[in-house]
């Protein structure tokens, strides 16, 4: 049993303290994204929110969750998405909408068709870490505003691509509303009290479903705050758990959420082990991220419509503007 507490601590393992989170193409081609076979949810959204969203990554669990959140919010889900493989004649059902999946070789032509029919479309990306930069470069080339919910990739190159193209983008390692608020508080503390934890020892443990290949972007963001607070940390020391058995027995993830969870623990100890601090945020399911992603798309759409001078945003910008539903 892994414990991040000092040996003298007799209280239960930190992950066990609370167990209340049991909730819930081939050849490039021109296409019509308003084909009769694509039936959109018959919900009338408020006029100010009536705009189309294309979710890239509907074949994945996170992308599918976002697509479902789009339709349940009364927004127009563009019935187009993409796969990393050239798979023909495949569709994914989202509510009453059949989303057609295209392979990578068709991306540019299909997206150009989408822009022709929906000039105000916003893309929400939940693909794979190794697709982040190529996707972002294409969105920027076509002038497509996008929300990058996919973590990983070369983040510096990602920001540079957006800056060089002057495109609109919202990039965040974390889309969960309340977790975003926690991150904002951590950043404020780091800015206001630099060096406050100088000399402290930090241990970090994160657990996600086995399908998550990269290290938690949220954990990286929190660690960056601790480093500003004076803590030295080697990312190679982070405990990354992806084994379901360990997640059940050691971390305490509810069995029904093994395939979709995000548990994080940060434990700080003073040089003499006499003082300790612990920060923990655990999420079961994907709804918190899906809803936040829709909020992000709404926010970015408003910025594009108002021709805002700022072009790159994050979820803290959304939070500060009070754009969370």
Swiss-Prot record:
Biochemical pathway: Amino-acid biosynthesis; L-lysine biosynthesis via DAP pathway; (S)-tetrahydrodipicolinate from L-aspartate: step 4/4
Active-site residues, Swiss-Prot/TrEMBL: 208 (proton donor/acceptor), 212 (proton donor)
Class of the enzyme per the UniProt entry, highest EC level: oxidoreductase
Amino-acid positions noted as binding (S)-2,3,4,5-tetrahydrodipicolinate in the UniProt annotation, renumbered to this chain: 217-218
UniProt keyword list: Amino-acid biosynthesis, Chloroplast, Diaminopimelate biosynthesis, Lysine biosynthesis, NAD, NADP, Oxidoreductase, Plastid, Transit peptide
Lineage: Eukaryota, Viridiplantae, Streptophyta, Embryophyta, Tracheophyta
Protein name: Probable 4-hydroxy-tetrahydrodipicolinate reductase 2, chloroplastic
Gene Ontology MF terms: 4-hydroxy-tetrahydrodipicolinate reductase; NADPH binding
Location(s), subcellular: Plastid, Chloroplast
InterPro entries the UniProt entry points to: DapB_C, DapB_N, DHDPR_bac, Dihydrodipicolinate_Rdtase_pln, NAD(P)-bd_dom_sf
Domain of life per record: Eukaryota
Function: Catalyzes the conversion of 4-hydroxy-tetrahydrodipicolinate (HTPA) to tetrahydrodipicolinate.
Cross-referenced Gene3D superfamilies: Dihydrodipicolinate Reductase, domain 2, NAD(P)-binding Rossmann-like Domain
Documented EC number(s): 1.17.1.8
Entry's family note: Belongs to the DapB family.
Residues binding NAD(+): 57-62, 149-151, 172-175
GO CC field: chloroplast stroma
